[in-house]
Amino acid sequence: MDKSQKNPTSQIGTSTPKSKFEDSPVFNYISNLSPIESVKSISTAQTFSSLSFTSPPPVFTSPHVISHRESRFFRCHNSVDRSKHLESLDGSAVKGEVVVPLVEDLNKEASLEDEEETSVETSSELPQIMKFDSQTSEHSDSPCTEDVVIEASSDPPRGDNGSSSEDVTMGLQNMLVVREGNDTPGCGRLISDATELLVFRSPNDSEAFRCLVDKISSSERRFCAGVKSTKRPDINKDIPANGSSNENQPLAVLPTNESVFNLHRGGMRRRCLDFEMPGKRKKDIVDDQQSVCDNNVAGESSSSCVVPGIGLHLNAVAMSAKDSNISVIHGYSISGEIQKSFSGSTTPIQSQDTVQETSDQAENEPVEEVPKALVFPELNLGSLKKKMRKSEQAGEGESCKRCNCKKSKCLKLYCECFAAGVYCIEPCSCIDCFNKPIHEETVLATRKQIESRNPLAFAPKVIRNADSIMEASDDASKTPASARHKRGCNCKKSNCMKKYCECYQGGVGCSMNCRCEGCTNVFGRKDGSLLVIMESKLEENQETYEKRIAKIQHNVEVSKEVEQNPSSDQPSTPLPPYRHLVVHQPFLSKNRLPPTQFFLGTGSSSFRKPNSDLAQSQNEKKPLETVTEDKTEIMPEILLNSPIANIKAISPNSKRVSPPQPGSSESGSILRRRGNGRKLILRSIPAFPSLNPNQ
């Protein structure tokens, strides 16, 4: 694992004396930024107050789902490494490094000699760390720790935005401060000695570094920015000019004028295995972590993120970053657990072009969160399908009611399917059903038998016309006869205002057939329908009464014409016309009167009146009296003034004509008048030629 192929072309010699770098302008600039006075380097061991332990061997080939613990963050002591400065071959540019060691104890400061010695050892190993061997593999699954190296340019960064050295100093100090998080136990176990660090070389590592999924905790954010620097020829040899990265290239290249906010975060692999409950892992990734990334320049697309060695649940999170339009520029492996602590050994991250970032720009940087709905999106699809199925079934149930018959075999009227004239289908939960097409003869025979007893059994409960709704809306108290129930409702407590009321459900008013109590149907009340029916009956009676009166008047006019113009076909005897008049008189008052018959004897002129009294309504008496009075008026005065005693002698057949017996009712007086009129008519016989030649 420790064998590494060193490339002499990529290594930078370390035999250059320190005095040469101390006189350089970059050294002077960095010394002005640092609050620590320069002293000579003394090799001392870097100490950590946290719990250190030897990492166990890598037994597992794939990481386990582990719980994510929040660790303590430490305030970094800003120091400048003045002992190691890299100069290009042509001497055109010099580049310096600001190495940020992390010490847990905030009250103690590491001496300058410790920092310089650590920087010397780290800088000498840079070519080995930056060069990844594509032949080795198998160890890309170990978690890594993150360290920050900020590269400073040889000149003060005043060319782009004109900021002074004091502004840069304040910006660097603000960016190198890592805010403290929640103090939770177990954070010290992530920090070990520098000798325990292992550099793994595999193509997966370079692929992971090429694709960055930058996730940090919502309560623990830090902001890092790079300052403008010049290119180094020996480093840029491995990087193509177009800014793309190869498979074996561990670092991604930032495009021009693109911010490097929170992107300079490298890492070395540490053999730390954490065996804890896997339940909290998903929750921490979804709830606690947020992605702070920069948007790509228009026209550029984010590279596909291939993170090696993560489980299926983390793959869902990694792939969801692409769907949420989060730009991916740098990459590092997030297998194992996401680190929240740092080690003293650092790995510099090189970029082709970097942009100066001030604290104000860092504060205005947008923060994007990973949506929770993107984790396991396939689970929502199944639930949506189930809901759609339920809604479809509910819609079918509402549109058509189905029966639940047990013993009637669906051949009774209370079976909704049978009463509606349809066959039972699948939604019905009936038992031993005969209401099916295979038993059509039985169904038809049963229907015919029920209709023979009740013809309206299968008739619709409500008969509605197009005008019924309009009529009901005009007057709520009136119910159109065309929209009334055939059977009627039987509501007791609902006042005909519920859906189970057949009248209310059909949109019609209650009728006389309804047996409801306290009806308040908005389409028509039961008492209102009674009034309408009574009014309609009165109107019918009035029309019938007028028609009958008109018919009586017409008969009176006809009788007048007969009297004024007697026909020549009548016999010479004066009695037949009057007898004809007397015979037709009962028909003049033929308005539902009990028949009062006048019998004319063959040999005698006697009249017989039945003993039964005549029951006549008051409305029917008046026209009869009017007719009789009019008839007496049209008689000649001679007949009115003639004596009654002569009737006996001059009767046609020499028979006595007995006057009618007076009755107690008014009809008796009417008949008496008729008898008097008849006597007067008989008295006028001498005016005609006598039938008896002897007289």
Curated annotation (Swiss-Prot):
Segments of skewed composition (Polar residues): 1-18, 602-618
GO CC term (a single one): nucleus
Keywords recorded for this protein, A-Z: Developmental protein, Metal-binding, Nucleus, Zinc
Expression by tissue: Ubiquitous but expressed mostly in flowers with highest levels in developing ovules and microspores.
Keyword Oxidoreductase: no
UniProt-annotated stretches for the region Disordered: 1-21, 107-127, 559-578, 599-626, 650-676
Motif (Nuclear localization signal): 269-283
Compartment(s): Nucleus
Source taxon at top rank: Eukaryota
Knockout-associated phenotype: Despite a wild-type flower phenotype, the null mutant presents defects in pollen, carpel and ovule development, including a failure in megasporogenesis. Small siliques.
SMART domains for this protein: CXC
PANTHER family in the record: CRC DOMAIN-CONTAINING PROTEIN TSO1, PROTEIN TESMIN/TSO1-LIKE CXC 2
UniProt protein name: CRC domain-containing protein TSO1
Organism per entry: Arabidopsis thaliana
Taxon lineage: Eukaryota, Viridiplantae, Streptophyta, Embryophyta, Tracheophyta
Chain's gene name: TSO1
